[in-house]
Amino acid sequence: MAYIEGNTGKWEYIIGLEIHAQISSKSKLFSGSSTIFAANPNSQVSYVDAAMPGMLPVLNKHCVYQAIKTGLGLKAKINKYSVFDRKNYFYADLPQGYQISQFYYPIVQNGTMEIPTSTGDLKTIRINRLHLEQDAGKSMHDQSPHYSFIDLNRAGIGLMEIVTEPDISSPDEAAEFVKKLRNLLRYIGSCDGDMEKGSMRCDANISVRRSGEPLGTRCEIKNINSIRNIIKAIEFEAKRQVDLLENGEAIIQETRLFNADSGETKTMRLKEEALDYRYFPDPDLLPLVISDELINELKANLPELPDQKIEKYTKEFGLSKYDAEVIVADESVAEYFEKAANECNPKMLTNWLTSELFGQLNKASIGINECKITPSNFAKLVKLIENDTISGKIAKTVFEIMFETGKAPDKIVEEKGLVQVSDNNVLNTVIDEVIAENPESVEGYKRGKDKLFGFFVGQVMKKTGGKANPTLVNQLLKDKLDS
């Protein structure tokens, strides 16, 4: 467990998260308006989104399905009966004067997610609920020195709010939870998880206490927009609370904003209670009733999820848990890996994938979907190494050409004359030449200077243009020098 070091001793982090995940859907939660990112202001607004009198919401079935699939991925209970409520508050970018949400009867409850801890163990984080709600619009204050403007393109977009219990005990655990949740949502296809575009936002509820004491007063940090900022915001806020408590001051329950530039949290408003929002069932929407048949159908059509893939890669492919997690962390990489792994040695493939390919992708600042090397050609390269057609050193040269051109490795090897020399007679001839040309080094080796062995290997490789089979060279050289 991580602690905050105060002037009077150690304090514990108590953290709960609320994740707002924008549902991957072409239309909004209660209207047919488009959800395309970065469209011209107010170009994707229906009469329902603008709250024109007499306009009634119509529930988007696809958004409901996405929420159910996400709940199944979280190993949660899917409630067969749920209700939409009105959350009443006034803000300029909320034209209805209320937000349609689910307070009393959410669609999903009681889920779990396991995350790795600093000790290497797995820790279970309980999911209190997942509920559906609509997003608000956006206030724009930088268009004019005299006026603020409202863009309602986001108003009515479907969100899944995923709320954890206060089971998180450090900033790093919070970051791990968000990363793992984001990956799960991407695999399911219910949210793209792009925090830079605002399609996934995190609120953190933070309090501190001494070990064994009751829970303290919490503060909520709103709209944290990156994994790095989650860590920084929690660290700052926890330290702020510890400083206040150690100076004999009380923590005020409030909502705060994190400033990424200063690394500090600032008061936004006093924290509201549920009573302040006057929740009541929305009279324009019927209760949502979900059948067992629908739940079973959606469950049967779920893709293979990250934890399932990790288990498969370790058991079927023999990968280490660490390597499996690295590959599964990106769905596109996992898909690429599986296509190639069906044609070659998975372990050797993993080594080349995580070192050479990842290195070149990072250098070129591109994703694996933009890579010119097909999974099939990558597998061919691994097989050429595996069957001793080329050495690992030559393979790196071949790989670089493949990355630039997309050519098949066997064609490159043929064109460049890079086939590994594994003929004993040819290699013995070269070795005899090297020994004859270096009598002093031979004498030195025979007197016990074992490090000279590497010199002889290097000379043989030099004479063969790096194409000699290194394993065979070592064996033949040793036989001759030790005789």
From Swiss-Prot:
Leading EC class: ligase
Catalysed reaction equations from the record: L-glutamyl-tRNA(Gln) + L-glutamine + ATP + H2O = L-glutaminyl-tRNA(Gln) + L-glutamate + ADP + phosphate + H(+); L-aspartyl-tRNA(Asn) + L-glutamine + ATP + H2O = L-asparaginyl-tRNA(Asn) + L-glutamate + ADP + phosphate + 2 H(+)
Annotated GO biological process: glutaminyl-tRNAGln biosynthesis via transamidation; translation
GO molecular function annotation: asparaginyl-tRNA synthase (glutamine-hydrolyzing) activity; ATP binding; glutaminyl-tRNA synthase (glutamine-hydrolyzing) activity
EC number: 6.3.5.-
Residue pairs linked by disulfide bridges in the UniProt entry: none
Keywords, in A-Z order: ATP-binding, Ligase, Nucleotide-binding, Protein biosynthesis
Subunit structure of this chain's protein: Heterotrimer of A, B and C subunits.
Function, in words: Allows the formation of correctly charged Asn-tRNA(Asn) or Gln-tRNA(Gln) through the transamidation of misacylated Asp-tRNA(Asn) or Glu-tRNA(Gln) in organisms which lack either or both of asparaginyl-tRNA or glutaminyl-tRNA synthetases. The reaction takes place in the presence of glutamine and ATP through an activated phospho-Asp-tRNA(Asn) or phospho-Glu-tRNA(Gln).
Similarity-based family: Belongs to the GatB/GatE family. GatB subfamily.
Protein name: Aspartyl/glutamyl-tRNA(Asn/Gln) amidotransferase subunit B
Lineage summary: Bacteria, Pseudomonadati, Pseudomonadota, Alphaproteobacteria, Rickettsiales
Encoding gene, per UniProt annotation: gatB
